[in-house]
A protein has these predicted regions:
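Catalytic and binding regions of secreted/periplasmic enzymes and modules that target cell-wall glycans
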Residues: 216, 223-349
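Positively charged, low-complexity/disordered segments
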Residues: 2-6
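Short secondary-structure boundary segments
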Residues: 151-157, 213-216, 223
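Short, functionally critical alpha-helical segments immediately adjacent to catalytic or ligand/cofactor-binding
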Residues: 194-221
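Cell-wall glycan-active module
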Residues: 7-203, 292-362
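Solvent-exposed, acidic/flexible segments
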Residues: 156, 185-193, 203, 207, ...
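Extracellular, surface-exposed passenger/stalk and repeat segments of large secreted bacterial proteins
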Residues: 10-19, 213, 257, 285, ...
């Protein structure tokens, strides 16, 4: 489920988008820090005391990992209030009442029913739910910390086997697709895993992030997908949208996304996406140039945009749980690979945060 992806950025004349220089250096020295060095590093970064115990546990298990404080300069309550505005963050209507907003424009007290904002089940999230999913301290563990991982492509540990792990139990695992070479016009076939690796090299975005995003956006079971990637929607035949780009919240998000993907006049990001290759690679270019290069270079910042660029808007997904869900998928992809990998995590720090973590809604 996506939101805010209908924004079309500056037209690119080349077939491949030239990316802006990244604000964070990708190459990291593979050196394990001692406990004393790590304590000094946390102090230098300015992490609050309420972050440190969880970070110590992560350092103990993964001494090669580095943790950077992303100082937002924003008041915590203000940020939560902005992200809690009706329609900005959605949650499944199947959740208990405490997770769902009861504001007048989100809930009808006379009928006891919630207003649906997307599809048939997505309603406005409560302020308590937003605070719970937005509080970085709730996710400083080796299961969900990946929402803070920097999303630039790092070839030293991001491999085909890792992408295959993400694609396992999906219709894309060990499968080929047909496409037309964007340079020669020749008909070819390619494995999906190869397409994600090529997309990473071209866009400079993490292939694990790209594969995880596609898995969340369009995979509906081990054998089925959304119609966004079948090329069979009658109003947009032969059009594919693997990342659901342009699928803004409405009663017909898939059609909105396919309309965006079919835009021949724009000519950007390899559009129109007339085969899986164009969609996977072109979509990666869009995500990288439109989000990562704008400073939204973690899953957390793509979900909760607390950067200076279009703050509190330009958010990739409306699903308030999306960053957490993608983090779990990344964890599975990394299994057995991470002990000595030089991952870098950028963790938001807000002003005036409560001493205790924001609790789960009850």
């Amino acid at each position: 489920m996506s939101r805010g992806l209908g924004d079309v950025y500056k037209r690119q004349n080349a077939k491949y988008v030239k990316l802006a220089k990244k604000p964070v250096t990708k190459k990291v020295a593979v050196v394990a820090m001692s406990d004393a060095q790590f304590e000094q590093a946390m102090k230098n970064e300015g992490f609050p005391e309420s972050y440190k115990q969880s970070l110590r546990a992560l350092h103990s298990a993964y001494p090669y990992w580095q943790f950077k404080a992303y100082k937002t300069g924003l008041d915590w309550n203000t940020a939560v209030t902005e992200e809690s505005k009706t329609g900005v963050n959605l949650i499944s209507n199947a959740r208990a009442k405490a997770w769902k907003s009861t504001e007048k424009d989100a809930y009808d007290a006379s009928t006891g029913k919630w207003k649906v904002f997307d599809g048939s089940t997505w309603v406005a999230a409560s302020k308590a739910a937003v605070a719970y999913f937005m509080d970085p301290r709730n996710y400083l563990n080796d299961r969900s910390v990946y929402m803070f991982e920097l999303l630039e492509y790092q070839s030293q540990y991001q491999t085909k086997s890792g992408v295959n792990t993400i694609l396992s139990n999906t219709p894309f695992y060990n499968k080929k697709f047909s496409y037309t070479d964007v340079n020669t016009g020749a008909a070819k076939t390619m494995y999906y895993v190869t397409a994600f690796m090529e997309a990473a090299k071209i866009s400079k975005a993490s292939p694990y992030h790209l594969a995880s995003r596609v898995k969340q956006e369009v995979v509906t079971s081990a054998t089925t997908t959304s119609t966004a990637v079948t090329g069979t929607v009658s109003s947009y035949p032969g059009i594919y949208n693997f990342y659901n780009i342009g699928a803004t919240s409405s009663s017909t998000p898939v059609l909105n996304g396919l309309k965006w993907a079919s835009d021949k006049k724009a000519g950007t990001y390899l559009r129109p996406w007339t085969d899986p290759y164009r969609s996977i690679v072109g979509g990666a270019q869009y995500i990288s140039s439109g989000y990562i290069a704008k400073g939204q270079n973690t899953c957390y910042l793509e979900k909760f945009n607390v950067t200076s660029y279009k703050r509190y808007s330009h958010q990739y997904m409306t699903n308030v749980e999306a960053a957490y869900e993608e983090s779990i998928k990344t964890k599975k992809a990394y299994a057995g690979m991470m002990d000595k990998s030089p991952l870098v995590f950028s963790i938001p720090v807000y002003e005036n945060m409560p001493a205790a973590n924001s609790p789960m809604p009850k």
